[in-house]
A protein has these predicted regions:
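Acidic/His-enriched low-complexity segments
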Residues: 1-257, 261-269, 394-396, 436
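Active-site rim elements
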Residues: 159-166, 244-250, 322-324, 372-379, ...
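Zinc-dependent metallopeptidase catalytic helix centered on the HExxH motif
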Residues: 168, 291-352
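Structural recognition of the beta-strand scaffold that forms the well-ordered cores
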Residues: 204, 237-238, 270, 275-278, ...
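Soluble non-cytosolic domains of exported or imported proteins
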Residues: 245-256, 300-301, 305, 324, ...
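Catalytic zinc-binding patch centered on the HExxH motif and its immediate surroundings
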Residues: 248-250, 265-270, 278-291, 301
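Beta/coil-rich, acidic/histidine-enriched accessory regions frequently appended to metallopeptidases
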Residues: 285, 411-455
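Acidic/His/Gly-enriched intrinsically disordered linker/tail segments
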Residues: 325-395, 406, 412, 439-455
Length: 455
């Protein structure tokens, strides 16, 4: 997507009116320059969706509340192949023009001034589709018969709802989802109600914590909900396809213990609820969708994967990468968190990773802080990212290391941040000069030799 800019800074009264000079610009993501939009900041998305399985169609009314960060005569939303029937801005009909592969350019009846709050309502229909993605993931949403699930990382949310589909613009969400009787719905946050109608049920959810678009989850299926209470009274709900049996007796039974360990290491769990959603197929991946990570029948029996996706609630979901180049802030940290869990539970720990990579390997000859757009999920992002944290942990000592992580999480909670932001926190808290270490481990093409960095 792209967005509207104001007059260029050198414009004066003699120049053309803003309509002529306004330009639509993206957010400048280094990997996905056409994703996301400038000119405004979204505060809230209200998604009202109706699933028609017979037609494999989702009817949607998405209400976006935003603030203009520039004077705007027009602005852009990310919208991929949405069949848009109407758009209003502040209740007045607006012109909407699909442009390129991702953009819906909206021209309101009246220009918006910098600082104005405005409300956009888009009425549309969407069909399931997956986009070309990076490595493991083809982002988008899947319908299998009556059933629906989503996995949007990195830029697939725009296949289901018009949005500023970039992790630097987080917002609160509510969901109202109408499905044929007999189907259930799971979504981020808390279930607020399920109201039966004529052959349908309407489920509503609120997700009051700041959330990136790629972390939205929506599952429609015949679902069983298993409820319990986690540390500090945290609501824990596991939502499991009714055709999937027995998973709650596996490593999933340790969920409260996992939360407890990470609360102790990293600070309080950041959101209103937790639990996983399990769909009835082997997905080949799991994704840390906020408050409700998605698992297939394969990964839900893996304790390390359950731990990894929980860790992402802190690292990735609460503190989100400001650009996709910063993806190691998600994956390296969740990988290191797995090792800290193993250490706490007597199953080894960080030294195991160091032993695995005692000798440099070409597998990790990719800089974690710049893997490239097709390698977001490369082994180096996970393991060399985690080794960077291992070297940091060993360099500053465990107490200082955990203070760095907690400071990072407190400072950027509900926000997005960069690799540079993390390096600054690490140096500030430790008082150490860490640039050479970060340069070697995050940015050098070749994997460093661990022996050169840890005694």
């Amino acid at each position: 997507g792209s967005g509207g800019a104001a007059d260029p800074p050198d414009a004066d009264a003699g120049d053309a009116a803003p309509e002529a000079t306004a330009e639509l610009t993206g957010l400048g993501d280094p990997y996905y320059p056409d994703v996301g939009n400038s000119g405004y900041d979204v505060g809230d998305y209200a998604l009202d969706l109706t699933w028609h399985p017979d037609e494999q169609r989702m009817d949607g009314v998405t209400t976006i509340t935003a603030v203009a960060t520039d004077d705007l005569t027009r602005f852009s939303l990310d919208a991929v192949d949405l069949d848009v029937s109407s758009v209003t801005v502040d209740g007045e009909p607006a012109t909407a023009t699909p442009t390129g592969e991702r953009d819906l350019i909206v021209e309101p009846a009246e220009p918006l001034g910098q600082g104005d709050e405005f409300v956009v309502v888009v009425t549309y229909a969407a069909a399931p589709q997956l986009l070309a993605g990076a490595d493991l993931l083809s982002p988008g949403w899947v319908a299998d018969g009556d059933e629906v699930y989503v996995a949007f990382e990195p830029h697939g949310a725009a296949t289901l709802f018009p949005s500023n589909d970039h992790p630097s613009d987080k917002a609160t969400y509510s969901f109202t989802v109408t499905v044929p009787t007999g189907l259930d719905v799971a979504a981020n946050g808390m279930l607020r109600g399920a109201v039966p109608g004529d052959g349908v049920t309407t489920f509503s959810f609120s997700a009051p914590d700041q959330m990136a678009t790629y972390l939205v989850q929506l599952v429609i299926a015949d679902l069983d909900v298993v409820e319990s209470t986690g540390p500090g009274g945290l609501p824990v709900r596991h939502v499991i396809d009714a055709d999937v049996g027995g998973v709650v007796e596996g490593p999933l039974a340790r969920t409260a213990e996992m939360i407890d360990v990470f609360d102790d290491l990293f600070g309080p769990y950041p959101f209103v609820a937790y639990g996983v959603v399990v769909v009835d197929e082997p997905l080949g991946y799991a994704l840390e969708t906020q408050t409700l990570p998605i698992f297939g029948t394969d990964a839900v029996t893996s304790e390390p994967t359950l731990v990894h996706e929980l860790a992402h609630q802190w690292f990735g979901d609460s503190v989100t990468p400001a650009t996709w180049q910063d993806i190691w802030l998600n994956e390296g940290f969740a990988t290191y968190a797995e090792l800290l869990w193993r250490e706490r539970t007597g199953q080894g720990g960080p030294d195991d990773l160091a032993a695995t990579y005692a000798e440099p390997t070409p597998l990790l000859d990719l800089p974690p802080a710049d893997p490239g757009p097709t390698e977001l999920f490369a082994p180096s992002v996970y393991d060399r990212g985690a080794l960077t944290l291992y070297v940091l942990d060993r360099t500053v000592g465990r107490d200082v290391f955990l203070t760095i992580l907690r400071t990072w999480l407190e400072r950027y909670d509900d926000s997005s941040a960069t690799t540079g932001d993390f390096e600054a926190v690490a140096e500030e808290v430790s008082g150490a000069e860490l640039t050479p270490m970060f340069d070697a481990w995050l940015r050098a093409p070749q994997m460093p030799d661990l022996d050169d960095w840890v005694g």
